[in-house]
C-alpha cells in the first residue's frame, strides 16, 4: 500500500511540472504566433505599415527634397543644405524611433516562412516588407551613414540594439540595394489594387535610393558609385518607358490643385 501511495504521489508531482497550459494562446484574439498564417493575414497586417509614408500636399516635396530656397519652411530637411542645422548636445531619439517601425516590419518578415502561403505569395509579402524596411533605412542612411542593421525581431534585451555593432555605410547601402532588387522581381506587379505598394513603387524607391547613394559616393570620393548610378539609370529608364505620362493631361492636375 505504501508503494502505491509513493507511486501516486510521484505521478501527481510530475504532473505539476507540466506547465504547457501556460503557453496556450487566446482562441478569439490574434497573437504573433497565430495571426500570420494566410495571405489575407499578411495583407491585413501590412495595412498598418503604410502609416510611415508621407501625406500628399501641394509643394510638400519642395521642403523634403534637394530643392533649397529662402521660402522653405524653417523645420524642413532642406536646412541641411542651407547649413542651418546644428547638432544638439543631448540625445535625439527622432530618427532612432524608426527602429520601432523596423521591428514591426521584421515581425511580419520573420513569420513568412512558417505560414501556409505558397512560395510565390511568400515572396510577394517578403517584397512588401523589404520595401517598407528599405524606406526607413534610407532615412537612417541619409542621416547617419552607418547604423545598426537589424533584419530580425530582437529580444527584450535593449542592449542588442543600443550597444550592438554599427554597420558600415557600405553594408547598409548594400542591404537596401539587395532588398529592393529582390522586391522588384517578386512583388505583385499591381500590388493589392489601387493605392498599394506595387512593382512601380519599388522601382521608384530603388531609383531614388540609387541616385542618392551614387551621387553621394561620387562627390565624397567613395567606392562603387557607378554601381548605384548604373542601377538608377536602368530602373529609371524602365519606369519612364512603362509610364511615359504621369497624367493624360497636365492641365487637369493644375485645375485639381487650383
Model-assigned labels for residue ranges:
Residues 130, 203-209:
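TPR/Sel1-like alpha-solenoid repeat signature
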Residues 60-71, 150, 188-204, 215-258:
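Short, surface-exposed recognition loops and adjoining beta-strand edges that mediate ligand/DNA contacts
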Residues 20-21, 57-61, 69, 140-149:
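Proline-centered turn/helix-capping motifs that create local helix->coil transitions or kinks
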Residues 39-43, 47, 51-55, 75-144, ...:
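Conserved, well-structured interaction surfaces
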Residues 27-31, 84-87, 152-160:
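Short linear capping/connector segments at secondary-structure termini
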Residues 16-60, 226-227, 236, 250-256:
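Membrane-proximal, proline-rich intrinsically disordered regions
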Residues 4-13:
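Sec-dependent N-terminal signal peptides
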Amino acid at each position: 500500500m505504501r508503494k502505491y501511495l509513493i507511486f501516486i504521489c510521484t505521478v501527481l508531482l510530475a504532473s505539476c511540472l507540466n506547465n504547457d497550459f501556460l503557453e496556450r494562446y487566446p482562441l478569439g484574439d490574434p497573437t504573433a504566433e497565430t495571426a500570420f498564417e494566410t495571405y489575407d493575414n499578411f495583407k491585413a497586417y501590412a495595412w498598418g505599415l503604410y502609416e510611415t509614408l508621407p501625406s500628399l500636399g501641394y509643394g510638400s516635396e519642395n521642403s523634403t527634397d534637394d530643392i533649397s530656397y529662402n521660402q522653405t519652411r524653417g523645420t524642413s530637411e532642406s536646412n541641411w543644405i542651407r547649413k542651418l542645422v546644428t547638432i544638439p548636445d543631448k540625445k535625439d531619439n527622432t530618427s532612432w524611433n524608426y527602429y520601432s517601425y523596423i521591428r514591426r516590419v521584421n515581425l511580419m518578415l520573420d513569420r513568412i516562412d512558417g505560414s501556409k502561403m505558397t512560395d510565390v505569395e511568400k515572396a510577394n509579402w517578403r517584397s512588401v516588407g523589404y520595401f517598407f524596411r528599405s524606406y526607413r533605412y534610407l532615412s537612417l542612411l541619409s542621416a547617419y551613414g552607418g547604423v545598426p542593421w537589424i533584419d530580425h525581431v530582437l529580444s527584450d534585451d535593449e542592449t542588442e540594439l543600443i550597444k550592438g555593432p554599427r554597420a558600415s555605410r557600405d553594408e547598409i547601402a548594400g542591404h537596401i540595394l539587395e532588398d529592393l532588387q529582390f522586391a522588384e522581381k517578386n512583388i505583385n506587379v499591381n500590388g493589392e489594387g489601387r493605392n498599394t505598394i506595387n512593382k512601380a513603387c519599388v522601382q521608384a524607391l530603388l531609383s531614388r535610393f540609387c541616385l542618392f547613394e551614387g551621387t553621394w559616393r561620387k562627390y565624397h570620393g567613395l567606392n562603387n558609385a557607378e554601381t548605384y548610378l548604373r542601377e538608377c539609370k536602368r530602373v529609371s529608364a524602365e519606369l519612364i518607358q512603362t509610364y511615359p505620362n504621369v497624367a493624360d493631361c497636365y492641365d487637369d492636375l493644375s485645375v485639381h490643385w487650383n
